Amino acid sequence: MIVKICGLKKAVDVAAAVDNGADMIGFVFAKSKRQVTVEKAHELAKNIPANVKKVGVFVNPTEEELMAAIKGVPLDIVQLHGQEPAKQANRTDAEVIKAFPVKDGKIPTNINDYPNAYILLDAPAEEYEGGSGKTFDWDKINRDMLTKNKLIIAGGLNAQNVQEAIKRFEPYAVDISSGVETNGEKDPEKIKCFIKTAKGVE
């Protein structure tokens, strides 16, 4: 199972994720309590080996902002968490994850407008997009609409429920942020526990 640890701001947290087998490291450039600058992400990225993909999280960015981060960090993947047009997701300079909020079990109808992107399903936003710590209603999802080899599950995951999520959705990857935090800060022990638990289900 591919595991993405998102919202990292400190070298110690990046090390905990990398050392325990994370496959993707997420840096949040959108307005958030987990926001980092391109310069900070560049410094943190120096400690990430080439086989671990660096992901930048954005909400309705300009093309200039995307390109600056892709080159400046550098990023392997951009994660679009807003209402970005399909043409912005159709790019060659980075892979793309397109996030969709799932409300009342309904998958947005425009999910098929992004055929080349990984599709990330998340809980509905609160103050900021993503990182709410809440799950969406797993029971109501029509899984026939989903392409498993492009599917990423996020929203309220933790070491206690990730195995259930993997069994239900058989996704390409799982994505976590607040579920590996204690008092709003990343917790290296929770990072380790989550990765080990997620990768125990194949």
UniProtKB/Swiss-Prot annotation:
Keywords: Amino-acid biosynthesis, Aromatic amino acid biosynthesis, Isomerase, Tryptophan biosynthesis. It catalyses: N-(5-phospho-beta-D-ribosyl)anthranilate = 1-(2-carboxyphenylamino)-1-deoxy-D-ribulose 5-phosphate. Its EC number is 5.3.1.24. Signal peptide: none annotated. One of its GO terms (biological process) is L-tryptophan biosynthetic process. InterPro entries: Aldolase_TIM (IPR013785), PRAI_dom (IPR001240), RibuloseP-bd_barrel (IPR011060), TrpF_fam (IPR044643). One of its GO terms (molecular function) is phosphoribosylanthranilate isomerase activity. Belongs to the TrpF family. This is N-(5'-phosphoribosyl)anthranilate isomerase. It comes from Listeria monocytogenes serotype 4a (strain HCC23).
